[in-house]
A protein has these predicted regions:
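Conserved active-site and cofactor/substrate-binding residues in soluble primary-metabolism enzymes
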Residues: 16-23, 37-40, 44, 68, ...
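Helix-rich terminal scaffold detector
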Residues: 14-21, 191-318, 322-328
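Single conserved hydrophobic/aromatic residue that forms the stacking wall/gate
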Residues: 1-12
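Short, low-complexity N-terminal leaders and the immediately following helix N-cap/first helix
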Residues: 10-82, 112, 343-368
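Flexible glycine/proline-rich
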Residues: 38-44, 52, 98, 119, ...
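Residue-level signal for inorganic ion chemistry
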Residues: 28, 70, 167, 203, ...
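Short, glycine/charged-enriched hinge/interface segments at domain edges or termini
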Residues: 16-21, 72-248, 383, 388-389, ...
């Protein structure tokens, strides 16, 4: 419920407590809206949800047509046809796709027809070319064709309006256009369609110690890896990412970048400066000029996450630790961006897998450990193995992980052979497993 979700924010912004992930997700989703509707070429809509119904302007197909190359016939002429008593018909014309035979087929007549061509008036079946004997000529007008079997009414004929009638909805608002669906839209008369615009997501890296990837860091410096990862993740979620650069630990510099991003974007994300340290200027800015709805989540990695509103725009402050920023984006930013783009709300698919080793958990928070799930080639069983280290600063474990091992709240000892839940970060939302 939207009002309940917004109310949760009122509760948590007044209390310095670790909030459950589900509450955090509900708060974020309740404070983002779908973007404006724009019109784009239909072929560019592949992978995107439509903003409105697509309605056929004509019947699809507008005429009955042949499903294969052959001869259009009156089935009544061939009711007695057999190998012992074949029926011979006069070929009175030839028809190909785009070249219409204007006449009508009468008793004892047939027309050579190609796949996709309109079935001539009077014909109610098509006999495929391979089983017809041409007695003389080249098989076109002036030839005779011999048939050795009956033809059923409708045989090898695609009916008019078989796909849709004029006025039918061929694709509903919210339905994601498949590549082949672009062809369906074209058949319904759509050269362009309406979708929700890609939300502009402003990304800012915070920290005096950060340098651009192109620079060699000096002692005490590190390359800014989070901005590249977050830009890629935002793009994958359906956003238009905009990088505003690296802000040093300076209150004025941070404020200038955050204000600019807030003016120009639909959603602002920062990484770094989200802990309770001395240099957490951005959370103080949001608290002073907007509102902070929560600033800690019962989750690892990603405990120190701030969400609020600044200038009426959603703001998400992620940890500077790469793994924490990644999990925070997956759990909070990605669902929000997809909602803004018009996708149905949802999360990555979750499936069960068998642990290949033991896992001990002593903290109460929910864990999302980087892992790899594979199917045993002999038994078909899904097996999940954690990365050797869960150090949140190591990027290689995120590159090679295809899932997050989800361990719910509370201490526990998991043993090899236990069945656990894994979040498939390699699969899109809505995937049926």
């Amino acid at each position: 419920d939207l009002r309940m979700s917004r109310g949760l924010g009122d509760v948590y912004k007044r209390q310095e407590i670790l909030i459950p992930l589900e509450d955090a997700q509900a708060i974020v989703l309740s404070h983002v809206n779908r973007t404006e509707v724009v019109e784009i070429p239909a072929w560019q809509a592949a992978g995107l949800p439509l903003a409105e119904d697509a309605v056929a302007d004509i019947d699809i197909s507008p005429f009955a047509n042949s499903a294969m190359d052959g001869y259009a016939v009156r089935s009544a002429d061939l009711t007695q046809a057999s190998d012992e008593a074949p029926v011979t018909l006069d070929v009175i014309g030839h028809e190909a796709a785009g070249h219409v035979f204007e006449g009508a087929i009468g008793a004892g007549e047939t027309v050579r027809i190609m796949t996709g061509a309109p079935v001539p008036e009077g014909a109610d079946a098509v006999v495929k070319y391979e089983i017809v004997d041409v007695l003389d000529g080249d098989g076109n007008e002036g030839s005779r064709a011999r048939f050795s079997a009956p033809a059923k009414v409708g045989e090898n004929v695609r009916s008019a309006a078989e796909e849709a009638h004029a006025g039918d909805v061929v694709m509903h608002a919210g339905e994601v256009v498949a590549p082949a669906g672009a062809g369906l839209l074209a058949s319904a008369g759509y050269a362009s369609v309406k979708v929700h615009a890609a939300p502009r997501v402003g990304i800012i890296s915070l920290g005096t110690e950060l340098v651009a990837p192109s620079k060699v860091p000096a002692r005490g410096q590190i390359r800014d890896s989070n901005s590249s990862a977050l830009m890629a993740e935002a793009l994958d979620a359906g956003a238009e990412p905009v990088f505003y650069g690296i802000a040093p630990d300076d209150e004025q510099a941070i404020a200038e970048l955050v204000h600019r991003a807030t003016r120009e974007c639909d959603f602002v994300i920062t990484s770094g400066g989200a802990s309770a340290g001395d240099y957490d200027y951005v959370t103080a800015l949001v608290r002073r000029e907007g509102e902070v709805l929560f600033d800690r989540i019962s989750m690892r990695p990603g405990k120190a996450i701030t969400f609020g509103l600044l200038g009426g725009k959603p703001y998400l402050g992620l940890s500077g630790n790469p793994a924490a920023a990644y999990v925070g984006f997956e759990m909070l930013a990605r669902p929000a961006i997809r909602k803004m783009r018009g996708f149905a709300e949802g999360v990555r698919p979750v499936q069960q897998a068998t642990l290949t080793h033991g896992v001990k958990k002593r903290q109460h928070r929910r864990f999302f450990d980087r892992a790899t799930v594979l199917r045993d080639p002999e038994t078909g069983e899904l097996l999940v193995t954690e990365a050797k280290t869960q150090n949140s600063a190591l990027l290689g474990t995120m590159q090679r992980a295809n899932c997050l091992l989800r361990i719910d709240e509370g201490p526990c000892d998991l043993a090899a052979g236990d069945v656990v839940d894994v979040v498939r970060v390699d699969l899109p939302e809505g995937t049926v497993l």
